[in-house]
């Protein structure tokens, strides 16, 4: 196996994103720092890859360093089944300003097949993500 070494944190992040896209679990494990590995990494990665379709990557910021670096990015994806956050949020008004305080996570909402899809495609759910 001829593996190139990333020259920056950004380059490694981009290559790991590509590995997620093509399902290269070996590379993902190989490029995960040993101190941060867990026994179930392989199974979690396999499940993620099976249930996720990656749509695109946008790097927002890269702060390089000699021994440490950071990369801020957004990865766009669809998951099967799709994920949702259903929350009951609490707010408080102080000094005339509404502020979010906290919230409770609630069970997922079941979507009707005849509702418009959550992705704003203007298609009904049954003809879009509900297939």
Task: List the predicted regions and their residue ranges.
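Cysteine-rich micro-motifs
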Residues: 1, 126-130
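Short, low-complexity N-terminal intrinsically disordered segments enriched in polar/charged residues
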Residues: 1-15
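Short helix-adjacent coil turns
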Residues: 16, 20-27
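Short solvent-exposed beta->alpha transition segments
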Residues: 22, 30-62
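Long C-terminal interaction/binding lobes of large macromolecular proteins
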Residues: 23, 33, 70-72, 92, ...
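Surface-exposed, charged secondary-structure patches
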Residues: 48-84
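Short beta-strand edge/turn micro-motifs at domain boundaries
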Residues: 84-112, 127
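Short Cys/His-rich zinc-binding micro-motifs
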Residues: 113-122
């Amino acid at each position: 196996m001829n593996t190139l070494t990333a020259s920056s944190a950004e380059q490694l992040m981009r290559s790991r994103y590509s590995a997620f896209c093509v399902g290269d679990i070996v590379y993902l494990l190989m490029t995960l720092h040993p101190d941060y590995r867990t026994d179930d990494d392989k199974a979690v990665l396999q499940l993620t890859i099976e249930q996720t379709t990656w749509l695109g990557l946008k790097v927002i910021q890269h702060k390089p360093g000699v021994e440490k670096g950071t990369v801020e990015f957004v990865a766009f994806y669809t998951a099967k089944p799709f994920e949702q956050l259903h929350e009951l949020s609490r707010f408080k008004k102080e000094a005339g300003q509404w502020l979010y305080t906290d919230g409770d996570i609630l069970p997922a909402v079941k979507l009707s097949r005849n509702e418009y899809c959550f992705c704003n495609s203007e298609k009904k759910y049954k003809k879009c993500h509900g297939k």
